[in-house]
Amino acid sequence: MRRVPLIAGNWKMNLDHLQSIAVVQKLAWTLKDAGHDFGAVEVAVFPPFTDLRSVQTLVAADKLPIAFGGQDVSEHDSGAYTGEIAASFLAALEARYVIIGHSERRTLHNETDEQVAAKTAQAVKNGISPIVCVGETAEDLEKHGASAVPVAQLRAALAGIDSAADFVVAYEPVWAIGSGQAATPEQAEQVAAALRAVIAEALGDEVAAKTRILYGGSVKSGNIAGFMRETNVDGALVGGASLDVAEFAAIIRYQKHVI
């Protein structure tokens, strides 16, 4: 089964709404000028929540073939949860995706596997495709190997959804994020294959075959092609490099470097 690659840019807590508009416009122009085929490689951006309405308006008005989504979502429908964002709010903004379980959420906000599962279920219930992030720390890697922790995290996240759900998995080794030291393509492939096996076990072979698995962690234009040659790697979740339009566009256009 052919899986359309997805290159997603997580802007984290960077860019205000005016800056986000400028970056999306410049990215769209750059890719259009380069003749990018959006049907061959999907593009998505994840601005801060305060920027989403501006990005939605721009994408709709200019009919830009760029998807967008939230960086996190609440595990609750609504209520007295100060500062949280309901999945229904993201759906009202026509967000296609939402990032769930990013290592920064797990580490800085002590997010548990149970919360990740609840957030994943909320996204699916509201028609949003969750990008479920999993990954091991350097200590985990040394103690348990590369795939043990990501496999356990994904297994927990899938507990709240069924085979009809549309979701994406992002493998982000914590030791690689923002470090400049990426995993090797072979390491990413090993873990991605293990994650696909977990999906097959939980939801069946058909779901596993169609689910996209991304790699994230110090992705740049100079190494993306190596990851994309691997059988089970279907794209990338890009952090800091996605803030540089020229660099992000070069990552998106990785196919010209793949032989």
UniProtKB/Swiss-Prot annotation:
Q: What class of enzyme is it?
A: isomerase
The family annotation for this protein states: Belongs to the triosephosphate isomerase family.
Q: Where is the active site?
A: 102, 172
Residues that bind substrate, according to the entry?
Answer: 10-12, 178, 218, 239-240
Provide the protein's localization.
Cytoplasm
What does the record give as the reaction this protein catalyses? D-glyceraldehyde 3-phosphate = dihydroxyacetone phosphate
Key words of the record: Cytoplasm, Gluconeogenesis, Glycolysis, Isomerase
The UniProt entry, under InterPro entries, shows: Aldolase_TIM (IPR013785), TIM_sf (IPR035990), TrioseP_Isoase_bac/euk (IPR022896), Triosephosphate_isomerase (IPR000652), Triosephosphate_isomerase_AS (IPR020861)
Which GO terms of the cellular component aspect does the record hold? Answer: cytosol
This protein's assembly is summarised as: Homodimer.
The name under which this protein is listed is Triosephosphate isomerase
Give the GO biological process terms.
gluconeogenesis; glyceraldehyde-3-phosphate biosynthetic process; glycerol catabolic process; glycolytic process
Q: What is its EC number?
A: 5.3.1.1
User: Would I find Ribosomal protein among this entry's keywords?
Assistant: no
Principal localization? cytoplasm
Question: PROSITE patterns, alphabetically?
Answer: TIM_1, TIM_2
Known function: Involved in the gluconeogenesis. Catalyzes stereospecifically the conversion of dihydroxyacetone phosphate (DHAP) to D-glyceraldehyde-3-phosphate (G3P).
Transmembrane region positions?
none
SUPFAM superfamilies on file: Triosephosphate isomerase (TIM) (SSF51351)
Q: What species does this protein belong to? A: Leifsonia xyli subsp. xyli (strain CTCB07)
Which pathway does it take part in? Carbohydrate biosynthesis; gluconeogenesis; Carbohydrate degradation; glycolysis; D-glyceraldehyde 3-phosphate from glycerone phosphate: step 1/1
